[in-house]
Amino acid sequence: MKNCDKITDIVRSTTKNQRNPIIRIIRVQAMELKYEQITHKIIGASFEVHNFLGNGFQEVIYQRALAYELTQAGLSFEREIEQHIYYKNLPHPIGKRRADFVVEHKVLVELKATIQLEDVHLAQALNYLKVYKLDVGLLINFGSKSLTFKRLIRSIT
């Protein structure tokens, strides 16, 4: 990863019992995001889908439209690859799951079509990153009036 100059952000926050805001200075080390070009194209394709279809459709409609847009963007992908889930030393899987997309064999994409993303959606996508052994993912929600997304990074523990 390439390091850039340090950036200073000023964050103002208040608590219920305070009248004056607390000003904190946060130094952020700006750096190139892993697979930034791929995720940028995926997000752009997602905006194209949302701008055309809007919200209110079932998730599968957005999956099909996004598959078309990813192809138009020149990205290779696989849809709903089945992945087995193992527990400890058990020799057989205890279950299986399918992520919506794996793009360029590097970025997991999980779609939702709900009014707002919930913690359970985030937990699901993070678990998929672990199961698929991928470092970067996008959780994209088409269900609200504006497209929303979260960029996910698998923590290595």
Regions found by a protein language model. Give the residues of each.
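Active-site metal-binding core of divalent-cation-utilizing nuclease and nuclease-like domains
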Residues: Q58, Q63-K106, T114-L117, L139, ...
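Domain-level recognition of nuclease-like catalytic cores that cleave nucleotide substrates
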Residues: M1-Q37, H121-L122, V136-T157
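Arginine/glycine-rich "motif VI" loop of SF2 helicases in the C-terminal RecA-like domain
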Residues: L129-D135
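Nuclease catalytic cores
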Residues: Y35-H40, G44, N55-E59, Q63, ...
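Electrostatic, structured charged patches in enzyme active sites and in nucleic-acid/phosphate-binding
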Residues: N51
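Accessory recognition modules or surfaces
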Residues: L33-I43, F47, K88-A99
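Conserved SAM-binding loop
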Residues: L111
